[in-house]
């Protein structure tokens, strides 16, 4: 149904031509930039948030805050809302402090929620630098599934790409489709600090099902464990990499302050070039280092400096070892994303450590050596 509104009244229309505005009811899973019909999704319209802020309800009902933020999330592609049941914590992922101020005011004016937010944290991501075959086996009593996934480094900014190169003789098409569907629907996280996994090509190489015992959900378990098992193997081989967001900046300060500015950028692990004609510095720097630098510039230039920032994607984390060391994430304790497999013997299922899966797998490995 296509609706054309006039104030609060509307009429049904059979078609909409270019330039007209209409409403389509009962769309539950649409999102900003989604292509409808034959149009492809517009990925360019969605900038990825780079900072995370924890919400302080200040006495407001936390569930009411969650409902309001979820509604705003549907309206703004730059806003992501994350609810942690374990921590009883509500976080918003944004582009920066200006968007945060606007959000805070909207919550107050539109929903009468007078909340505050804690200091922003950088949103890291994880990726891989080597190719690996991850294996997941799920075989409690009266269940069976095994999945082999080839994980390869993807192009920067490509996200997660899924495909199948598995023979129909090895695994029925329905099972293959189920595996790919499960992989696409899950938010995969890394094993370094539990940050989202990105820029990885994941290909279903082979697998095994049981006519008698494989039921719905078994390959969801096996495929998820396969990804995690592959990541744990790469961690052991130092084949993982932590990524962080970087700013592209343009900094203009008085000539006598150029030395200070260049020294600051170097201290931030940034790179820059100097336009001698205008005295302008331009370059790249980590968001974690430069997110609060605008205030510093205003202070040491007495308001005469100008800093322009734009997010320029994710790059190698400049202090990876420090970030990983400061993280309390333990991939083996993350039961919702376990790398362990489950095998069956004597009528009972038992857990097998990720490192022992290669010698226990029922299907032969596709990658040799």
Question: PLM ranges: what are they?
Answer:
Residues 45-59, 162-167, 243-253:
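Short glycine-/aliphatic-rich beta-strand segments at the starts of folded cytosolic domains
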Residues 62-86, 174-190:
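Phosphate-interacting basic helix/loop segments used at nucleotide- and nucleic-acid interfaces
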Residues 142-184:
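Glycine-rich, flexible beta-strand/loop modules in the N-terminal catalytic cores of phosphate-handling
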Residues 207-246, 250, 255, 259-261:
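Glycine- and Gly-Pro-enriched alpha-helical subdomains that act as flexible
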């Amino acid at each position: 149904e296509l609706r054309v509104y006039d104030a609060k009244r509307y009429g049904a229309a059979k078609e909409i031509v270019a330039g007209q505005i209409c409403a389509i009811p009962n769309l539950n899973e649409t999102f900003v930039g989604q292509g409808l019909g034959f149009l492809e999704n517009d990925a360019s319209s969605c900038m990825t948030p780079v900072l995370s802020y924890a919400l302080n309800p200040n006495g407001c009902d936390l569930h009411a805050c969650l409902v309001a933020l979820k509604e705003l999330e549907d309206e703004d592609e730059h806003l992501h809302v994350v609810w942690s049941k374990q921590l009883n914590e509500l976080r918003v992922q944004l582009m920066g402090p200006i968007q945060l101020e606007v959000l805070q005011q909207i919550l107050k004016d539109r929903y009468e929620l007078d909340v505050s937010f804690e200091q922003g944290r950088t949103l890291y991501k994880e990726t891989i630098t080597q190719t690996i075959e991850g294996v997941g086996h799920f075989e409690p009593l009266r269940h069976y599934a095994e999945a082999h996934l080839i994980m390869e480094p993807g192009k920067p900014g490509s996200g997660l790409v899924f495909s199948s190169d598995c023979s129909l003789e090895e695994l029925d098409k329905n099972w293959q489709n189920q595996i790919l569907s499960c992989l696409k629907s899950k938010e995969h996280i890394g094993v370094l600090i539990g940050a989202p996994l990105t820029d990885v090509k994941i290909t279903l190489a082979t697998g095994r099902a049981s006519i008698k015992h494989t039921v719905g959900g078994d390959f969801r378990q096996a495929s998820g464990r396969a990804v995690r098992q592959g990541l744990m193997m790469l961690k052991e081989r130092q084949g993982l990499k932590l990524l962080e967001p970087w700013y592209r900046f343009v900094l203009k300060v008085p000539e006598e302050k150029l030395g200070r500015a260049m020294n600051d950028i170097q201290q931030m692990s940034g790179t820059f070039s100097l336009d001698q004609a205008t005295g302008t510095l331009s370059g790249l720097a980590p968001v974690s280092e430069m997110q609060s630098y605008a205030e510093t510039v205003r202070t040491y230039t007495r308001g005469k400096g100008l800093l322009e920032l734009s997010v320029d994607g994710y790059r190698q984390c400049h202090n990876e070892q420090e970030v990983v060391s400061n993280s309390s994430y333990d991939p083996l304790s993350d039961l919702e994303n376990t790398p362990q497999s489950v095998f069956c013997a004597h009528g009972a299922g038992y857990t097998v450590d990720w490192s022992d899966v290669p010698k226990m797998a029922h299907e032969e490995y596709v990658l040799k050596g």
